[in-house]
């Protein structure tokens, strides 16, 4: 996967955040049990640096285009420092640190691996658009005309596509790949292209 991802390029940079698969919990432990979440993260940071990516770990960066600018923020995973009841030792989502130097007037895009953070992100009042993934619609979408059902509805109040509250938006990408069972039913791999236009 890293070889394919390394071809991604952008004139304004490629930005990333940590997700649950980056912590190494789904890999078989080495015989000496040294492949810890911290070791997995160090390895991933090195790989991303070699690819020219910028990891946003409770940090924000301004992108300027002429007289205009937007701020891209990225928050850490997991939200509370625990994954499935296990402490990662890598901290968690810290919105105060993330938005420390972000002006209220700036247009902000926040990247949060999990959409479960959105209520806190929205209440912080900085993010105009939040981009998330994680859910994969639980790898199952049943389509009935224009209606779609997924078991993700039982666990997540927001699980796929576009949501809005006032002037704040959340988009959840269905991603690609799988966990546990090697299939995706009606949940097609997704790459999302979002065009930003200035208000008229």
Locate the predicted segments by residue.
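Conserved beta-sheet core of the metallophosphoesterase superfamily
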Residues: 15-16, 109, 115-192
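Short beta-strand-to-coil "C-cap" segments at the C-terminal boundary of structured domains/repeats
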Residues: 194-200
């Amino acid at each position: 996967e890293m070889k394919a991802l390394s071809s991604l390029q952008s004139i304004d940079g490629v930005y990333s955040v940590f997700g649950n698969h980056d912590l190494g919990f789904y890999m078989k432990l080495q015989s000496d049990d040294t492949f810890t979440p911290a070791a997995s993260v160090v390895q991933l940071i090195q790989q991303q640096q070699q690819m020219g990516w910028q990891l946003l770990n409770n940090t924000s960066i301004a992108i300027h285009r002429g007289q205009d600018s937007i701020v891209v923020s990225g928050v850490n995973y997991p939200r509370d420092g625990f994954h499935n009841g296990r402490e990662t030792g890598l901290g968690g989502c810290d919105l105060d640190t993330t938005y420390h130097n972000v002006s209220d007037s700036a247009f902000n895009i926040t990247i949060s691996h999990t959409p479960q953070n959105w209520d806190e992100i929205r209440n912080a009042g900085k993010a105009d658009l939040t981009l998330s993934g994680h859910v994969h619609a639980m790898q199952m979408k049943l389509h009935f005309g224009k209606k779609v059902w997924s078991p993700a509805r039982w666990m997540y109040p927001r699980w796929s596509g576009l949501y809005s509250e006032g002037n704040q938006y959340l988009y959840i990408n269905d991603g690609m790949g799988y966990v546990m069972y090697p299939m995706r039913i009606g949940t097609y791999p997704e790459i999302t292209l979002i065009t930003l236009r200035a208000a008229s």
